[in-house]
Regions:
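N-terminal ligand-binding/catalytic initiation module
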Residues: 1-127
């Protein structure tokens, strides 16, 4: 199997993982900022990042923002976010199926949705 998942320790975040699948070209970071109110809820952004650091910074910033948004809305969800680096890659069903495999490894701690450049049709590939 070509899926590789590495956990990244970041102070103030419950879990941050970086997942690579060489076969499907997946390069994603999922950041779970906080699950005190419930599982982390946040979208997956498909974006062209120039570097790993830029991608990670975006995931961290956005997942913390989702914690605040979900809390302000008084819903029972924490905050999380996923970002997929699509620089030089095609968005394919296999890419999003591979992303779904990564989400499943979090065992319900992160719930995904659409976000910038990730559409319903892309997420239909995850089911």
């Amino acid at each position: 199997m070509s899926l590789k998942i590495n956990e990244i320790s970041v102070k103030g975040y419950e879990k941050v993982i970086h997942a690579i699948n060489e076969t499907t070209k997946l390069d994603c970071i999922i950041s779970v900022h906080n699950t005190k109110l419930g599982p982390a809820l946040g979208g997956v952004r498909s974006w062209s990042y120039n570097s790993f650091d830029e991608q990670k910074t975006d995931a961290l910033r956005l997942s913390e923002a989702m914690t605040l948004k979900n809390s302000i809305c008084r819903i029972n969800f924490g905050g999380g976010k996923a970002v997929i680096n699509i620089r030089g890659k095609n968005k394919t069903p296999e890419l999003y199926q591979s992303y779904a495999e990564v989400v499943e490894t979090l065992k319900g701690d992160y719930l995904t949705a659409g976000d910038v450049n990730t559409f319903k049709e892309d997420l239909m590939e995850c089911s």
